Protein backbone atom coordinates (compact mmCIF):
# COMPACT_ATOMS: atom_id res chain seq x y z
CA UNK A 1 0.00 0.00 0.00
CA UNK A 2 1.24 3.44 -0.86
CA UNK A 3 0.15 6.58 0.94
CA UNK A 4 -1.08 9.75 -0.70
CA UNK A 5 -2.59 13.07 0.29
CA UNK A 6 -6.37 13.46 0.09
CA UNK A 7 -7.61 14.09 -3.45
CA UNK A 8 -10.40 16.39 -2.38
CA UNK A 9 -10.03 19.88 -0.95
CA UNK A 10 -10.38 20.19 2.82
CA UNK A 11 -10.70 23.63 4.38
CA UNK A 12 -10.67 24.15 8.15
CA UNK A 13 -12.07 27.34 9.64
CA UNK A 14 -9.41 28.61 12.05
CA UNK A 15 -12.03 30.12 14.38
CA UNK A 16 -14.62 27.34 14.53
CA UNK A 17 -12.63 24.26 13.55
CA UNK A 18 -15.36 23.35 11.02
CA UNK A 19 -14.08 21.23 8.13
CA UNK A 20 -15.50 22.03 4.68
CA UNK A 21 -15.27 20.10 1.41
CA UNK A 22 -17.22 20.90 -1.76
CA UNK A 23 -18.70 23.91 0.07
CA UNK A 24 -20.36 21.61 2.63
CA UNK A 25 -19.49 21.30 6.32
CA UNK A 26 -17.97 17.89 7.05
CA UNK A 27 -17.33 15.72 10.09
CA UNK A 28 -14.06 13.86 10.42
CA UNK A 29 -14.55 10.89 12.73
CA UNK A 30 -12.74 7.57 13.21
CA UNK A 31 -14.19 4.73 11.11
CA UNK A 32 -14.82 2.56 14.19
CA UNK A 33 -16.88 5.36 15.76
CA UNK A 34 -19.18 5.64 12.75
CA UNK A 35 -19.51 1.87 12.19
CA UNK A 36 -20.13 1.09 15.87
CA UNK A 37 -22.91 3.70 15.98
CA UNK A 38 -24.34 2.34 12.72
CA UNK A 39 -24.40 -1.22 14.09
CA UNK A 40 -25.99 -0.12 17.39
CA UNK A 41 -28.81 1.70 15.58
CA UNK A 42 -29.32 -1.26 13.25
CA UNK A 43 -29.64 -3.58 16.26
CA UNK A 44 -32.13 -1.26 17.96
CA UNK A 45 -34.36 -0.64 14.92
CA UNK A 46 -33.85 -3.76 12.82
CA UNK A 47 -32.25 -3.89 9.39
CA UNK A 48 -35.42 -3.23 7.34
CA UNK A 49 -36.50 -0.16 9.30
CA UNK A 50 -33.01 1.28 9.46
CA UNK A 51 -32.36 0.60 5.76
CA UNK A 52 -35.53 2.51 4.82
CA UNK A 53 -34.56 5.48 7.00
CA UNK A 54 -31.05 5.51 5.53
CA UNK A 55 -32.35 5.21 1.97
CA UNK A 56 -34.67 8.20 2.33
CA UNK A 57 -32.12 10.38 4.12
CA UNK A 58 -29.31 9.34 1.78
CA UNK A 59 -31.39 10.02 -1.33
CA UNK A 60 -32.29 13.50 -0.10
CA UNK A 61 -28.67 14.31 0.75
CA UNK A 62 -27.29 12.89 -2.50
CA UNK A 63 -29.81 14.85 -4.57
CA UNK A 64 -28.92 18.08 -2.75
CA UNK A 65 -25.16 17.51 -3.13
CA UNK A 66 -25.45 16.61 -6.82
CA UNK A 67 -27.55 19.70 -7.59
CA UNK A 68 -25.01 21.98 -5.92
CA UNK A 69 -21.98 20.32 -7.52
CA UNK A 70 -23.60 20.22 -10.97
CA UNK A 71 -24.28 23.94 -10.75
CA UNK A 72 -20.80 24.75 -9.42
CA UNK A 73 -18.90 22.69 -12.01
CA UNK A 74 -21.31 22.94 -14.96
CA UNK A 75 -21.96 19.19 -14.97
CA UNK A 76 -24.92 17.41 -16.56
CA UNK A 77 -26.25 13.87 -16.86
CA UNK A 78 -23.84 11.00 -16.33
CA UNK A 79 -21.01 13.41 -15.51
CA UNK A 80 -22.82 14.41 -12.30
CA UNK A 81 -23.16 10.75 -11.26
CA UNK A 82 -19.52 10.01 -12.10
CA UNK A 83 -18.38 13.05 -10.11
CA UNK A 84 -20.47 11.91 -7.15
CA UNK A 85 -19.10 8.35 -7.24
CA UNK A 86 -15.58 9.74 -7.44
CA UNK A 87 -16.10 12.02 -4.44
CA UNK A 88 -17.60 9.17 -2.38
CA UNK A 89 -14.57 7.06 -3.25
CA UNK A 90 -12.25 9.84 -2.10
CA UNK A 91 -13.90 10.11 1.31
CA UNK A 92 -12.99 6.70 2.70
CA UNK A 93 -16.26 4.79 2.31
CA UNK A 94 -14.65 2.48 -0.24
CA UNK A 95 -14.03 2.53 -3.98
CA UNK A 96 -17.28 2.88 -5.94
CA UNK A 97 -17.01 1.38 -9.44
CA UNK A 98 -19.81 2.08 -11.93
CA UNK A 99 -20.37 -1.06 -14.00
CA UNK A 100 -23.43 0.16 -15.90
CA UNK A 101 -25.58 3.26 -16.03
CA UNK A 102 -28.86 3.97 -17.81
CA UNK A 103 -29.69 7.65 -17.52
CA UNK A 104 -33.05 7.22 -19.27
CA UNK A 105 -34.19 4.59 -16.75
CA UNK A 106 -32.47 6.32 -13.83
CA UNK A 107 -30.59 3.17 -12.86
CA UNK A 108 -26.99 2.17 -12.30
CA UNK A 109 -25.10 -0.92 -11.25
CA UNK A 110 -22.31 0.03 -8.85
CA UNK A 111 -19.76 -2.25 -7.22
CA UNK A 112 -18.09 -1.29 -3.94
CA UNK A 113 -14.51 -2.37 -3.38
CA UNK A 114 -12.53 -1.83 -0.17
CA UNK A 115 -15.69 -1.19 1.85
CA UNK A 116 -15.19 0.58 5.18
CA UNK A 117 -17.78 -1.81 6.62
CA UNK A 118 -15.85 -4.93 5.63
CA UNK A 119 -12.59 -3.43 6.88
CA UNK A 120 -14.19 -2.72 10.27
CA UNK A 121 -16.58 -5.68 10.68
CA UNK A 122 -14.89 -8.35 8.59
CA UNK A 123 -16.98 -10.74 6.50
CA UNK A 124 -20.34 -11.04 8.27
CA UNK A 125 -22.19 -13.19 5.74
CA UNK A 126 -24.73 -10.43 5.08
CA UNK A 127 -24.82 -7.23 3.09
CA UNK A 128 -23.57 -4.39 5.24
CA UNK A 129 -23.50 -1.64 2.61
CA UNK A 130 -27.26 -1.06 2.37
CA UNK A 131 -26.74 2.46 3.70
CA UNK A 132 -25.38 3.43 0.28
CA UNK A 133 -28.46 2.40 -1.74
CA UNK A 134 -30.14 5.81 -1.48
CA UNK A 135 -26.96 7.60 -2.36
Where in this protein do the model-derived segments appear?
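N-terminal accessory segment detector
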Residues: 1-109, 114-132
Amino acid sequence: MTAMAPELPIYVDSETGVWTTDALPMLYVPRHFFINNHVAIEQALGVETYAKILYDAGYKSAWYWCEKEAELHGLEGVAVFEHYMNRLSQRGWGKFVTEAIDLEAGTAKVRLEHSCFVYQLGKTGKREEYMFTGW
